[in-house]
Amino acid sequence: MYIYLPVALTSINMFLPFMAGFGVGILSGLFGVGGGWLMTPLLMMMGISPVVAAATDANQIVAASASGCYAHWRIGNVDFKLGIHLLIGSFTGGLIGVQLVKVLRALGNADVLIKISYVIMLGIIGTLMFIESLSALKKKKITKEEAPSTQKEKKFNQFLKNLPFQTYYSTARVNQSMISTILLGLIVGLLAAIMGVGGGFLMVPVMVYLLEVPMHVVVGTSLFIVLFTCIEVTILQSVMNHAVDIILAILLFLGSTIGAQIGASIGAKLRGEQLRIILASIILIVTIKMILDLTLTPSIFIAPKGGH
Amino acid sequence: MREKKFTVCLTIFVLLLFNIQKLWADSFEVKPEKIVINFTYHGAKLKIIGQGNCAGKDFIINILSTHKEKATFKKIEKVANLIWMKTGDLHFENVPFFYHVYSTRPLEEILTTKDLEDHNLTFDTLKKEVNLFPVKDENQKNFLWQEFIKYKSKYHLYAYEVVPYNCKGEGQNQVLEISIPWPYQAPPGKYQVKIYEISGKKIENIDEKIVEVEKVGIVKFLTDFAQNHALIYGVFSVLIALISGFLVGLIFKKGGH
């Protein structure tokens, strides 16, 4: 059945966004990422303009992350204190990042550097995460869920822990300096704003490897952060671009809220290193896709301004 | 006296000619004149109906939005001989948002190149009216214009197509019927429908009609809401998303997951 989307100004088979939402919702519930990297191109393939696709996706993520966050909270996987501290950092980082982008663009050729750095960074994160999870799986360290780290990382982690304003994150069961948590949130927010992405792919590894939070709590807490980030983006996109299509969003979150619940229950059955290796594989696939997008000759040599 | 007679005759001849010309023009009909976009809208069919001698003739229908667009695009260029990137802004001014041409045979078989150019019936001739900037030279302008056509065609906003037509009946009582698909991508607004009647590579008659595309019901309400009360709309969208998320969470909890 076809329905007309009032803001996207196009007609769509309602089954398509429902299925796309369901698939992305599972990933969201499993790994605590928003899934904008997958949903926005999928919506564009359905004939939605890039601006409306990006804005409506943010609205969809609000529902999926609320659903996923609720599911994780029920099983005790959301550390609200940690989430709030990271949010304070990432909001501030986002504000600084937006200004920094303007300065970088004024210097010229910044977009190329940003794009290349993002691909390299994702590639490194994905590869390291993959290698670490693979070795953890091989060693079958299943008694205690702990993110393994190298000596160098341990030294850095120790430095972060020794900073002042120590606090105990009870759900995550880690002692950390509030300064290091807010600082890491700020760096993720800064990078996300510069690179024009949601930040889930960066936030998850930071929590796992630098803050040493157990993987299951990382997923729940990351969803809590994603939820608030996307509330802000949805309202900003509505006010500034009039680009949120509520009908499309409803179709998407009909699927994604259910998907997020299923993702969360699948995640609860998997071990931390299993979750990490699947996420690492997805990050690597996204990296390869980005490399192909950047290097393969496009079919059309112009693109509308706006969107991702 | 002779001159007076000649002037009267000439006037009568011109009036007569004009009326003969108008015979077709007055009898062309476009159905529907108003296309309504409701919740289940998925495009429409536009019918061009005419009465008169249509056997052996050709027809061209040019549909274009009355609203001219100012569009900003980004060029995609290879940077540092390495990667494809969106680069500088590219502005297209005075372009119709929607431009479709339908003909009963390939255009070049129906009309001369000059006539096609004079009446703006090809994408190339349309380019002359467009203000495209910044461009280095004419070659780059041509290239970017072709890319613009590709982009518009991808979203069914620009198209050229040969369509079949039906000519039934005898002599002056013949009935012409041309059915044209109206794409759902055409946004609300007014569209000019120009119908060209052609015989022997000569335009015999041109008629113009207006088709209006309008949103109604919930589609209109939501568009107005998004445009005129953007902040409330944004908050409303967030609330719906939050309620849906938690509601599904509760349902799953009750379901025992």
Positions of PLM-derived features:
Chain B
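Membrane-proximal low-complexity regions enriched in glycine and acidic/polar residues
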Residues: 84-182
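A short tyrosine-centered beta-strand micro-motif
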Residues: 189-195
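N-terminal edge beta-strand
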Residues: 26-42
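Short, aromatic-rich amphipathic segments at membrane interfaces
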Residues: 181, 202-235
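Sec/Tat signal peptide C-region and signal peptidase I cleavage site
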Residues: 20-25
